[in-house]
Amino acid sequence: MQRGLGTFAAALCLATASPAFAHHSHPLVYDWCKSVTVEGRVESVEYKNPHSIIVVRQDDGTAYTVDWLALDALTRDRILESAKGALAFGARVSVTGAPIRTLAEIQKSFPDFKGEVNPRTIDPWQIRRVGDTFSWALPQSPNPANCAGVFRTPAR
């Protein structure tokens, strides 16, 4: 009985972990061999669970949105508490991160991938804001420095 219950519990954990792994599969979605850096002034910050959002506007007027991923409540609280002063409106920040892969790049690197990619993450689009921690650039641009995009940053 104990063994059967343990096997059932393990199977249940694995079954429910798959969707979470797919959602947070960073090597699949981000190209960690490249990096993109954006510098500018903080336009707004939204502290919320599970992703806080920071908007940064470059001196040329281009805006980026950074989706700040926090790993757990303790980490999130610590990061948000320490970041509140540094990320005040008008503060100058530098954001560096890995650019998002295109659907074609994902399928080339992971031939068995049969899923879908949210079109918002692979199509070029002008973004209103930028944040600070790990980043994406728009995939169609040959020069990531000229991209307007969404950035994601791993919590530290």
Question: What is the role of each PLM region?
Answer:
Residues I100-P142:
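OB-fold/S1-family single-stranded nucleic acid-binding modules
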Residues G61-L71:
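A short macromolecule-binding patch
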Residues M1-A9:
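Bacterial N-terminal signal peptides that target proteins for export
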Residues F21-V36:
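Short boundary/loop segments of OB/S1/cold-shock single-stranded nucleic-acid-binding domains
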Residues K48-R57:
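Short aromatic-glycine-enriched beta-strand elements
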Residues R76-V95:
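Short nucleic-acid-contacting surface segments enriched for D/E, G, S/T with interspersed K/R
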Residues G40-V42:
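Conserved hydrophobic positions within beta-strands
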